[in-house]
């Protein structure tokens, strides 16, 4: 989870940002259709064996496009990552999912991710595979937030860190403001929304 070094505009630094990410407008929705089509084309996921896992990834990409909005086209690949890392993004449109989880059967992958969640490491969700994809997509979105919005996320993060009554988040969200944002957006997609997830959504666009 989390971002590596890098940046740029879209795939390999040469992609295109969403011209209008506002999902409440017809222009914004049409733009998301274009970005989703490009993302699916760039993400054949040939090295993922179980079609159910592949379908979960594609569904996560589509639901994120419809609910949050892709900031640009995304290429999703599966490859080996360090032990314990579920995924990574370079901040420039490329997302890597760890084959240690995603190359397994859907049943085994979901069990391992669910066990991680039950151990208190990640947000509570009923779709752990999709939640991992949503988390990495949220890192890409965070990289495009304005400075003022990142400051607002930081302020919300400080409030969250002092909240002793919060439930369903897990330890990873406490790492820093960006991980808090990514976990919160993921939780808002397939978990139970709360005041923090709702506030993060309002800060997104």
Regions flagged by a language model, labelled:
Residues 15-205:
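Active-site-flanking segments in enzyme catalytic domains
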